[in-house]
Amino acid sequence: MAQLHRWDFWCFSTKPLGYLDVVQAIEAEVYDAWRQLRQSANPSKAWHQWKSETRKLFQDLDKKLRGQQEAVVHVAHATFTVAEMQYRQCGGEASHIVF
């Protein structure tokens, strides 16, 4: 049985656009890239270089944000587990009101 080859493409996540600093950095970067393209002797090469560098930057940013989100979820899960254990160890209905 032949296995189909699967191509995985990275898609730009719109989550970083929720941060004003990121949007302003993108705007400044685009303006600089536009200026460089206008002055370049070989705009196609400059464009592909800028595109690959920008893609790498966005991939790294996306990876960092996902890592931070996973860390927050892990801490919240641990906190919830501790609260759940304390709830089960408490005796009586009056003690359960605290939780």
Swiss-Prot record:
Note on domains (UniProt): The RxLR-dEER motif acts to carry the protein into the host cell cytoplasm through binding to cell surface phosphatidylinositol-3-phosphate.
The organism of origin for this protein: Plasmopara viticola
Protein name (Swiss-Prot/TrEMBL): Secreted RxLR effector protein 94
Protein purpose: Secreted effector that completely suppresses the host cell death induced by cell death-inducing proteins.
Motif (RxLR-dEER) on chain: 35-55
Protein family per UniProt: Belongs to the RxLR effector family.
Alphabetic keyword roster: Host cytoplasm, Host nucleus, Secreted, Signal, Virulence
Upper classification of the organism: Eukaryota, Sar, Stramenopiles, Oomycota, Peronosporales
GO CC list: extracellular region; host cell cytoplasm; host cell nucleus
Subcellular location(s) per record: Secreted; Host nucleus; Host cytoplasm
Predominant cellular place of this UniProt entry's protein: secreted
Gene: RXLR94
Superkingdom of origin organism: Eukaryota
